Amino acid sequence: LGDVEMTEEAHDFINRGLMLFPDNLILKDELCYNLEIEGDIKRAIEVCNELIDKNPYSNDYWFTLGRLYSISGDYEKAIEAFDFALTCDDSNEELKILKAYCLYMNENYEKAIEVYNDIATTDDIHIRITPLLAECYIKLENYEKAYVLLKELLRQNRQLKDSSIYINYIRCCVETGRDKEASDALMQASRLFPKNIRILSLLALTYLENGDEHKAMEATERLFTALDQVEDKQQEDFE
């Protein structure tokens, strides 16, 4: 029922079942999922802990608990839960990605890098984690390492849809003295993301610094037009 957005009906069904079978782990697992869908993360965490009390060696329960803590912003507890999950099964790459994300959010960038580098990458996972790994290096001000990662990623995938990858790449080019490369990347990004607020801001500033007032004005007008259409903007246009 929960999968077809009938959360109230699902919750009622689960509660009726638990009244009859209060120790049924399948029903409690469904309740935990349903509470998460409803946005009651605190109660979902409580139920998940009850599940772990019954089966402390379940990778799935610890993974769920870590994910719930990450949603609530309690990254320290999320990391702890993920560590327990990994002792049960260390082959879950999605779990490692989430753990690395929580380490990043907890400002433990060196450890996040270790976890990212420990992930067995397929092509799809490589595309997902390389920008995240680069962001860790940027936080550590190791712009050269981040530059190498992002340059290779963009070389292999010329039509990436994540504007933040280009923005971080441009920053790394600037920080490492590759001004021509930064300019070329900015031009490419402006073509791929013509309504992106941050890219338009960078474009206008670059033209202004280069003394091209006409193009700076054009870019600024495009920026104002994009800002006027905020209600139609996708989140990526602000990244």
Residue ranges, per PLM feature:
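Register position in tetratricopeptide repeats
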Residues: D3, I37-E38, I71-S72, M105-N106, ...
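Short coil turns that delineate tetratricopeptide repeat
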Residues: P22, P56, D90, D124, ...
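Start-of-helix register in tetratricopeptide repeats
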Residues: I26, D60, E94, R128, ...
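Canonical positions in the second alpha-helix
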Residues: R16-G17, E50-L51, F84-A85, D118-I119, ...
